[in-house]
Amino acid sequence: MKATAWNTGWLFRHLDSQEKFVPVTLPHDAMQAEPRTELSAGGVNSGWYEGRDYEYIRRFIPDKSLRSKTLMLEFEGVYHLAEVYLNGEKVAERPYGYTNFYADLTDRVRFDEENELRVIARNSDQPNSRWYSGAGIYRPVMLWTADKQQHIALNGVRIRTVSINPATVEVTVRTVGAGRVSVDVLAGEKQAASAAADTTGEITLTLTVPDAKLWDVEHPNLYTCRVRFGSDEDLQTFGIRTLSWGKKGILLNGERVIVQGACIHHDQGILGARCYAQGEERRVRLLKENGYNAVRSAHNPCSKALLDACDRLGMLMMDEYIDHWYIHKTEYDYVPYFEKWWKQDMADMVDKDYNHPCVILYSTGNEVSETAQKKGIQLTRELTEYLHSLDNTRPVTCGINIFFNFLSSIGFGVYSDEKAKK
């Protein structure tokens, strides 16, 4: 599918006011413009910023060439409780503020007239986070288009290294419609390997790459996988590397790697929660220069730009799902939505991460004292098994503080629904 940035032409205002809309360019952190006061309900966790609710609108007249296209609008991150409306009709929602999600505009767009896209983001429900969250549409928005009858499915290309001697990769392609799929592995502009076959919906092609340059933390060599199907084309950057784990720890290309990592949150300092590719790359570069070879996305799925930077610079990534499950850590956090949404959230996280060689590990949660309870132990199994069903090429862990669990087991838990209300 073809991607077009949709970051300009937006208007913004507070949801609970009749103030005039002002133009903004995405990514946009609405919370940074709020007053800072000692009376802020978020307190030190929010940087003393007050919380409000917001609305964004974008008016557009679609090009006539889009009539025969599938139209999918991707929001990489909206904090939080996002609702998306097209011409007054709700077309998407996502409570979690850190996972990318899609609004299907196909057959809903009105041609030859102006359309209005409206996005609501809420952040007045303070406190809802244990760190500075930012607010609004703080990550990029992309419009994905393709022929309705025949195209590569969204997130429909998955690349897996089978072996490194010889260097062999499997490319699985999901399509809408039947036809011939061709796959090329490119080293720069040069074709390194190719294969083709007919498909009726899903096919896996195996390619051997001669004289392959492997990906690791010291030599982050990257290739491009070009998939063609009908008039559609998909380009995926990937690295050839194997990953295994066991008694010897993490093995990358059969060699043990000592993981020297740091936890990083999603904000970019004085830029707030806005996600800029240059800012993400700067963070990774500084960490590499200071001896780190791994980062943990604390405590939520990271941006696509951060993954790209880690791929290019040779930084390992542990992508983490969430800070809590069913026990509140703040009064208005994600707990009420977790049970309904965790599977979709995780599926979107894996779709985002799968082709990135930097991702070596998933985490289902951070300091989850639920694991001290029978219910929580069962949930741990469900989360882990579900992630393995989505991606069996990477291990799954969970941030567990044994001392916190001990305190919880004797009735003195650090986290509890009651404490979250104080």
Question: Model-found features: residue ranges?
Answer:
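Substrate-binding/catalytic cleft of secreted carbohydrate-active enzymes
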Residues: A294-K422
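N-terminal carbohydrate-binding accessory modules
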Residues: M1, L154-T161, L214, R226-L287, ...
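Conserved, mostly hydrophobic/aromatic
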Residues: G88, V141, Y223, G254, ...
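Extended acidic/polar, glycine-enriched regions
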Residues: R110-D112, R174-G246
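Short hydrophobic beta-strand segments in globular cytosolic domains
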Residues: V91-A92, A192, V257
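Short strand-turn-strand beta-turns centered on an Asx-Gly dipeptide
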Residues: Y85-V91, L186-G188, G230-S231, N253
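Accessory beta-strand-rich segments of carbohydrate-active enzymes
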Residues: A3-D16, A30, S46, G51-I152, ...
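Surface beta-strand/loop "capping" patches
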Residues: K148-G177
